[in-house]
C-alpha cells in the first residue's frame, strides 16, 4: 500500500510544536511531556500547519534542499511514525 501524499497532516489537539531555547532545538510539547526533535524532524514539523498536504511539504523541502535523494520517502516515513505515535492526524 502506497502512502497518500494528498493527505494533510495536523498536530493533534494538545500537541504543540515550538522552539525551546533550553533544549536548543525544536520540541513537541504534549500534556504528558515533551519530545525533542532532530533537525530533519524539526524542518518537517515546521511545515505542518493544517493547510499543506504532504506533497506540498515535500515540494517545499525539495526547494530548500534540491537533489537530496529519497527526500520524499524520508518525509513519508516521518509522517507514518508521527501518526503511529499519535502526534498528528492525516486527513
From Swiss-Prot:
GO molecular function: quinone binding
Pathway in which this enzyme or protein is active: Cofactor biosynthesis; pyrroloquinoline quinone biosynthesis
Key words, A-Z: PQQ biosynthesis
Gene3D superfamilies tied to this protein: Coenzyme PQQ synthesis protein D (PqqD)
Any Pfam family hit: PqqD
HAMAP family: PQQ_syn_PqqD
Function: Functions as a PqqA binding protein and presents PqqA to PqqE, in the pyrroloquinoline quinone (PQQ) biosynthetic pathway.
Family assignment from sequence similarity: Belongs to the PqqD family.
Subunit structure: Monomer. Interacts with PqqE.
Protein name: PqqA binding protein
Species assigned in the record: Pseudomonas fluorescens (strain Pf0-1)
